[in-house]
């Protein structure tokens, strides 16, 4: 599998922006109400059940922009209160979901203090201690295992990777980051194993669980782009010339750098692909699994195959059509024929998943299918039946999408008609 061809993090972040600097000093007028928080809980929450209320408060946070530190502190204070009350009144042990919410809230605090490494460490230490306490009382609880995986991935990003520079050395860390990542992925594998053991795959019918795979992809994307001048800068000048972009992408890490092993290994990209496939398999075992979630997983798989096809696709089109490469037999270790066959196989796989990701209410998903068809058509001989059939089908899809969106996809349609 080609190195870091699965980079879906940027697309995912466009849907779900993780804000790091959101807690700012309020004005004098606002400060008087800063310690007051009124939350309207979902209707289905039992007002007489304190754990149910805690779950409702947590759900409110999850469905928000997740930029309110006051709400996170509210969760923690409520957990502290329930814990004290439970200890005082000698009630039955608190359920696993309590420990999961408590640990998650503690870890979330780190995102509001990313410039204060000591606090980040403190929050993650407390979060992991809480989740381990929960697991001691509820061994192999699947919700707690999911929570632990998510916290560990966040810890890798914020505590271990965020402070690094190009000059960082593995000797500066108490643990090697690839070892931490291996241990974290092992916890997630225990989630999969536990679901299989219980024959209950409902844990996967939740975008919060799918976030684990997105968080891993985010980490791999950060590692792949580590050291680039505009890394993580969404406001960078889009008019930078291509030569400068190429120079930025060529940043090399020393063998002693904490991210060197991850950056120079294919295994984490392959792990992401394999376990995303397994995620989809587990979803399909549910009678009433979320259609939206299935489409999202299929979309990610389709995009991953498209991205993996980029290098062989470029090799094929260059060797076949670029006069400057006349007489050259190979590029990137591939002949024209090999590049063509590999690209056709990958884009065909991508099309299968993109079709399964199609949403009748979202023309963007239709256009994704059409664009993949055009790419596949480009890999066949000019004016061949295979190419013509793919172009004709893509044109139908683009015309339909263009009509229902009042011309939003006119450029894509015009480009295809120009090819024809």
From Swiss-Prot:
Q: What is the protein's given name?
A: Enhancer of translation termination 1
Q: Which GO terms describe its cellular component?
A: nucleus
* Native organism: Candida dubliniensis (strain CD36 / ATCC MYA-646 / CBS 7987 / NCPF 3949 / NRRL Y-17841)
This molecule's function is given as: Required for correct translation termination and probably involved in regulation of hypoxic gene expression.
Organism lineage reads as:
Eukaryota, Fungi, Dikarya, Ascomycota, Saccharomycotina
What keyword terms does UniProt attach to this protein? Nucleus, Transcription, Transcription regulation, Translation regulation
Location of this chain's protein in the cell: Nucleus
List this protein's GO terms for biological process.
positive regulation of SREBP signaling pathway; regulation of translation
Record's family?
Answer: Belongs to the ETT1 family.
């Amino acid at each position: 599998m080609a190195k870091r061809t699965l980079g879906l993090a940027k697309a995912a972040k466009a849907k779900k922006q993780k804000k790091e600097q959101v807690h700012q000093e309020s004005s004098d007028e606002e400060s008087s109400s800063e310690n007051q928080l009124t939350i309207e809980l979902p209707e289905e929450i039992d007002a007489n059940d304190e754990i149910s209320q805690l779950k409702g408060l947590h759900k409110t946070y999850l469905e928000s922009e997740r930029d309110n530190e006051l709400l996170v502190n509210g969760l923690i204070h409520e957990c502290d209160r329930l814990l004290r009350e439970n200890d005082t009144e000698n009630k039955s042990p608190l359920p696993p979901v309590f420990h999961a919410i408590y640990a998650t809230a503690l870890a979330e605090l780190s995102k509001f203090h990313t410039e204060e490494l000591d606090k980040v460490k403190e929050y993650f230490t407390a979060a992991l201690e809480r989740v381990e306490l929960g697991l001691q009382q509820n061994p192999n609880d699947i919700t707690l295992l999911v929570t632990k995986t998510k916290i560990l991935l966040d810890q890798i990003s914020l505590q271990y990777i965020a402070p690094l520079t190009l000059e960082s050395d593995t000797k500066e860390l108490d643990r090697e980051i690839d070892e931490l990542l291996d241990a974290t992925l092992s916890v997630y594998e225990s989630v999969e194993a536990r679901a299989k053991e219980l024959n209950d795959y409902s844990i996967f019918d939740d975008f919060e669980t799918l976030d684990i795979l997105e968080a891993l992809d985010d980490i791999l994307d950060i590692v792949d782009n580590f050291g680039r001048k505009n890394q993580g800068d969404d406001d960078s000048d889009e008019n930078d010339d291509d030569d400068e972009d190429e120079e930025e992408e060529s940043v090399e890490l020393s063998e002693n750098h904490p991210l060197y092993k991850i950056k120079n290994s294919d295994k984490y990209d392959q792990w992401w692909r394999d376990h995303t496939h397994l995620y989809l398999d587990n979803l399909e075992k549910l009678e009433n699994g979320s259609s939206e979630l299935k489409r999202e997983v299929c979309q990610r798989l389709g995009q991953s195959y498209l991205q993996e096809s980029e290098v062989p696709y470029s090799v094929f089109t260059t060797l076949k059509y670029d006069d400057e490469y006349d007489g050259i037999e190979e590029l990137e270790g591939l002949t024209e024929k090999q590049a063509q066959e590999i690209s056709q196989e990958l884009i065909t796989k991508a099309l299968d998943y993109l079709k399964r990701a199609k949403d009748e209410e979202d023309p963007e998903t239709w256009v994704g299918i059409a664009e993949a068809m055009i790419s596949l058509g480009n890999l066949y001989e000019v004016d061949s039946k295979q190419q013509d059939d793919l172009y004709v089908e893509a044109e139908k899809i683009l015309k339909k999408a263009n009509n229902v969106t009042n011309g939003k996809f006119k450029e894509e349609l015009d480009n295809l008609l120009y090819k024809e």
